[in-house]
Amino acid sequence: MQTRLRVYITGEPGVGKTTIFLKVIDKLKSQGYSISGFYCPEVREKGQRIGFKIKSLDNEVEDWLASIYAKSSIKIGKYYITINEDIINKIKEKISKSEIIGIDEIGPMELSVPKLKEIIDYVLNEKPIVVAVVHRKISFKDGKTFVVTYENRNRLDNEIFNYIISSIQ
């Protein structure tokens, strides 16, 4: 598989970007593609967001990415970056072995962690096929960007999946 394909998913907060991303990843896995990467779900406590986890797409690796409770030298908004370097190394190892890479999200928080930014740069520069959720204020010149809205979110996963399949076959 020598195709170079970049698919970006963006939209306003809470519109369903992660849901669509995970549906697309699941559909690709069901077709037998080797996929790895990570996603960063929010963590809520009593209805309030208290931070973010980082999880490998196979859910074998998980840890805190950022929290309002932890203290560290890197702070984005109200969140302190707390990621463990061992977690980053495990995710990087998984990524090196896969043909399709999924990332949710490429945003200010993820890019503020030097080792995580290294992985993102490596993936974008070296891996043939990337599907990534991108913060609404970040854009890339290469690839195709899909904007999630309340109007299209119930069908966009199929549109993205079909675009990827038609582009790599």
UniProtKB/Swiss-Prot annotation:
Gene3D superfamilies registered for this protein in UniProt: P-loop containing nucleotide triphosphate hydrolases
SUPFAM superfamilies noted in UniProt: P-loop containing nucleoside triphosphate hydrolases
CDD domains per UniProt: RecA-like_Thep1 (cd19482)
A Pfam family annotated for this UniProt entry: NTPase_1
EC number per UniProt: 3.6.1.15
Reaction(s) the record says it catalyses: a ribonucleoside 5'-triphosphate + H2O = a ribonucleoside 5'-diphosphate + phosphate + H(+)
InterPro entries listed in its UniProt record: Nuc-triphosphatase_THEP1, P-loop_NTPase
Keyword Electron transport part of the UniProt annotation: no
Positions annotated to bind ATP: 11-18, 100-107
Enzyme class of the recorded protein, top EC level: hydrolase
GO molecular function: ATP binding; ribonucleoside triphosphate phosphatase activity
Entry annotated with the keyword ATP-binding: yes
Entry keywords, A to Z: ATP-binding, Hydrolase, Nucleotide-binding
Entry superkingdom: Archaea
Similarity section: Belongs to the THEP1 NTPase family.
Job of this protein: Has nucleotide phosphatase activity towards ATP, GTP, CTP, TTP and UTP. May hydrolyze nucleoside diphosphates with lower efficiency.
Name this protein carries in UniProt: Nucleoside-triphosphatase THEP1
Species: Sulfurisphaera tokodaii (strain DSM 16993 / JCM 10545 / NBRC 100140 / 7)
